[in-house]
Each structure stands twice: as C-alpha cells, then as structure tokens.
C-alpha cells in the first residue's frame, strides 16, 4: 500500500480531490455540478501557475520562498503600466520580463554565489515586497482597464482564456519534463548533483533556469490575480509561497529533489483550493484560511517523511533478506535446548 502511494502520488492526489468532492456533495447536493468544478479551477489558476514554477525549483533540490513577493511586485508593475496608458500586451510582456529577471537573480544567488536557497530567497522576499510598496506608496492600484478583466471571462465550457492557457502550459511543461533532455536535466540535478556534473549536465545553468522559470510563472500568476479581481492590493501575493510548496509536496514533489511531476503539483493546487471551498461551505471565517493551509502543509510534510522512512526500511529489508537465511529445524531445536540448559543452570 505504501509503495503504491509513493509510486502513484498523482493518483493519490486525484483520489483525495474526488473524496473531498463527494464529501462536499453530501453536505450540499448543489456542490455536485460542473459549474462547481470550473469555479474551483478558476480560483486555483494562480496557485497552479505558482506550483508549476515551484516544481521546477524543487526538482533541483532547492526552494523559493520569494514567489509571493514576486507575484505582488509583477502585479504592481502591470497595474502601474496600464494606468500609465501602455497597451495590455506591452504591460504583460514587461511584467513577464520582470518576473524572469527576479527569478534569474535568485538563481544567480544560489548557483553562482553558493548562498543556500532558503536564505537567498528569504532575502529577496523582503526585497521584492519592499520594491512593490515603494512603487505604490503603500496604496492600492485601482481603475484597471476592462480589457484586463476580460481575460478572466468564461469563453468555452465555463473556462476563461487564461484558464485554457494555464491548462496548455501545464501540459507543455509536463511533456518537457517527462520526454525531453531539457526536463531530464532537472531530475538529474536534483537527484545526484555530482553525478549529473560527471554526465556533462551544466547544473548551475539548470538551477538558474529553474529559478528563472519560477519567476516567469510568478509573473503570470500576478497577471491572473489582477485580471480576476480588477485591482491590486498592497498585500498581493502574501502567503502564496507556502501554498505553492504545499501543493507540490501534496502532489508528490520531493523536497529532496529529483522526483515528482507537474501534473501532481497541479492536482495538489486544485485540492488546496478545494479546501477553501470547504471553509466557505461550512461557513468558517476567512481568517482560518492561513491556519488550515499551514496545518495541511505540516500534515503533508509529516506524512511524506514517514512514508519515505517506511519505504526505505522495506527496501533495506528486501536488500539484505537474501543474506539472512531462516534457521533449519535442527538449528532451531539446538537453540531451544541451549536456552533450556541455560535456564536450568540459572535455577
């Protein structure tokens, strides 16, 4: 059972989604509808994009806790440029470039300057959040053009243009990681850094690429955020980094690097967003969201750690079982007699 869960984390995440969907349907029959599925998917798009980016970084055995601030900073740039009169394509392109540059800077700190990823991205978390607040003066950005909001309007099967773009992007990244040398380099770097170098993989560039892609995904998440709500608060992106990491771990991405898929991360993001629906349906106050998200992250990490320990014990047992042969009947009988004689001597 444990081996099945470990080897089929995507199926496990999908099963969790179905079970939660059925549970909510039992509480309220109106929840069992296609409209509910698309509504949850629409709410999950930001987290899905961040989970795709986090997957790239975590596969290389790193972590990025600055993506929430990167998302907020990119959303602010988008709003500032749109309100300054720039066209939507130009503003979106500049936003995407800013996200990639922010991710590239993180990658340089980690790969070239050899700063631990958690330390480097904690620093840039504050840096990017500070830049965001300096741009806005601590104020919200409002009055965004209708063209931006139109990106999140349903176009087909109740899913917006941004929603379809997110699905296509997820499938593309899943294919790149699973079927190309480009993707295999990420797995090799995270699984065995020295071994990957001996095979000719440019591990520093792979890690910088991972952080850069992560920054690009954060920029896309900022665009989606602005298009969905129509304004940009000064706390945009706060706490999203923890949810992105939780979604990845829930979907089977290892914190030790080298294993997991984008599809699993997407399913993990959908499941976490579904939990928010539970809070709404059960009329639980919104300020419980962070507590629930932290609890889920902690639970997933504990479960993942215990699962790996159990599997390692099983592997060791199987590895050395052939060296430990069971005692023959004569050996067992001799051992019993020896124990009986020892007991008599003690008596």
Curated annotation (Swiss-Prot):
GO terms for cellular component: plasma membrane. The keyword Metal-binding does not apply. Keywords: Cell inner membrane, Cell membrane, Membrane, Transmembrane, Transmembrane helix, Transport. Signal peptide: none annotated. It is a multi-pass membrane protein. Pfam families: BPD_transp_2 (PF02653). It is found in: Cell inner membrane. The chain crosses the membrane at residues 14-34, 39-59, 72-92, 93-113, 115-135, 155-175, 213-233, 249-269, 284-304. GO terms for molecular function: transmembrane transporter activity. It comes from the Bacteria. The complex is composed of two ATP-binding proteins (LsrA), two transmembrane proteins (LsrC and LsrD) and a solute-binding protein (LsrB). Belongs to the binding-protein-dependent transport system permease family. AraH/RbsC subfamily. Part of the ABC transporter complex LsrABCD involved in autoinducer 2 (AI-2) import. Probably responsible for the translocation of the substrate across the membrane. This is Autoinducer 2 import system permease protein LsrC.
